[in-house]
């Protein structure tokens, strides 16, 4: 009998729409591969829904809270339902960008200069030399991210909104000019490196998910030694945070820095996008792994105590 796979998608984070698109793509591919699939638009009754469904595997395609921060992983552990991607601890660490920075730096993965600040601090005055980047400490898909440039006399006024939806803790980091690079890890296998050219000022939400929002250059147009270093650092980051299944690490590379400090890891994504414009499926395809083979591998890799 075919395995029953519950594809967890949607949820209530700011990345809900992207998750629904990822979930639809994955569910369709899993059905084509012969699995019995139930699409679950995750609500706060998810534990009750999954208890009733009794799936063999939960395929987690949620982005943001609660699917990327360890919450859904903890529920699945309690219900004893094997699941895809990373476990409770790795998910929580990667979602907390400030904590992830500490872990990555300790493992030898270079991170940008910066640190955690409150929204109130960030809204009052520049908290570091411009240009710098402000981003929610527990956000994703570049939602709520600002580049504070040299010609800006004051921090972004959006930070003073009473209905600010992205939490009270922000990560402030120096802005690294240059190339946007990304690399994925699949189990213990590191994939290739993509160079991203955005039509926007930076690789924001629209660039990531709107057709034509960015151009993906694969393989990236960088020197072989930099290419291999990105791959090595991606695998190191995956292991340092204790990731499982598939992860994607994002980097900036400034070729003008000749002292070796030009390659910086921005973050590790434990729930990378799986839409038609997403990077991980593209990297897998470049390695000869079809989308159907990728999602099948993720189902068969699912387990508990990840």
UniProtKB/Swiss-Prot annotation:
Any idea which GO molecular function terms this record carries?
ATP binding; D-alanine-D-alanine ligase activity; metal ion binding
Reaction(s) this enzyme catalyzes, per UniProt: 2 D-alanine + ATP = D-alanyl-D-alanine + ADP + phosphate + H(+)
- Family as reported in the entry's similarity comment: Belongs to the D-alanine--D-alanine ligase family.
**Classification via InterPro entries:** ATP-grasp (IPR011761), ATP_grasp_subdomain_1 (IPR013815), D-Ala_lig_Van_CS (IPR000291), D_ala_D_ala (IPR005905), Dala_Dala_lig_C (IPR011095), Dala_Dala_lig_N (IPR011127), PreATP-grasp_dom_sf (IPR016185)
Residues of the ATP-grasp domain: 101-300
Q: Does the keyword Magnesium apply?
A: yes
- Relay the cofactor remark from the entry: Binds 2 magnesium or manganese ions per subunit.
Q: Which residues bind Mg(2+) 1?
A: 250, 267
Q: What does this protein do?
A: Cell wall formation.
Q: In which pathway does it act?
A: Cell wall biogenesis; peptidoglycan biosynthesis
Tell me the residue numbers annotated for binding ATP.
Answer: 128-182
Q: What name does UniProt use for this protein?
A: D-alanine--D-alanine ligase
Has the keyword Metal-binding been applied to this entry? yes
Predominant localisation class = cytoplasm
Cofactor names from the entry are: Mg(2+); Mn(2+)
A single Gene Ontology CC annotation of this entry is: cytoplasm
Give the GO terms filed under biological process for this record.
cell wall organization; peptidoglycan biosynthetic process; regulation of cell shape
Residue positions annotated to bind Mg(2+) 2 are 267, 269
HAMAP family, A to Z? Dala_Dala_lig
Tell me its EC number(s), please: 6.3.2.4
**Keywords, alphabetical:** ATP-binding, Cell shape, Cell wall biogenesis/degradation, Cytoplasm, Ligase, Magnesium, Manganese, Metal-binding, Nucleotide-binding, Peptidoglycan synthesis
């Amino acid at each position: 009998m075919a395995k029953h796979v519950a594809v967890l998608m949607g949820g209530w984070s700011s990345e809900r729409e992207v998750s629904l698109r990822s979930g639809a793509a994955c569910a369709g591919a899993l059905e084509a591969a012969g699995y019995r699939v139930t699409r679950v638009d995750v609500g706060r009754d998810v534990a009750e829904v999954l208890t009733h469904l009794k799936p063999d595997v939960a395929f987690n395609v949620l982005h943001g809270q609660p699917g990327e921060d360890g919450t859904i992983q903890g529920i699945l552990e309690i219900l004893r339902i094997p699941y895809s991607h990373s476990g409770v601890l790795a998910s929580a660490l990667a979602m907390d960008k400030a904590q992830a920075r500490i872990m990555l730096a300790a493992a030898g993965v270079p991170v940008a200069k910066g640190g955690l600040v409150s929204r109130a601090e960030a809204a009052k005055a520049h908290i570091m030399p411009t240009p710098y980047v402000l981003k929610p400490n527990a956000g994703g898909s570049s939602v709520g991210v600002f580049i504070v440039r040299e010609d800006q006399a004051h921090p972004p006024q959006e930070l003073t909104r009473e209905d600010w939806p992205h939490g009270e803790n922000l990560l402030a980091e120096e802005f690294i000019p240059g190339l946007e690079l990304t690399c994925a890890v699949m189990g213990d296998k590191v994939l290739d490196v993509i160079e991203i050219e955005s039509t926007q000022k930076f690789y924001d939400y629209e660039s990531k998910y709107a057709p034509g929002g960015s151009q993906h250059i694969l393989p990236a147009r960088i020197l072989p030694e930099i290419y291999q270093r990105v791959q090595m650092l991606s695998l190191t980051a995956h292991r340092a945070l204790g990731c499982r299944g598939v992860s994607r690490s994002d980097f900036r590379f400034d070729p003008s820095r000749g002292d070796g400090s030009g390659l910086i890891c921005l973050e590790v994504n434990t729930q990378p996008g799986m839409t038609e414009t997403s990077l991980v499926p593209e990297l897998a395809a470049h390695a000869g792994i079809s989308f159907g083979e990728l999602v099948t591998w993720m189902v068969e890799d699912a387990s508990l105590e990840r």
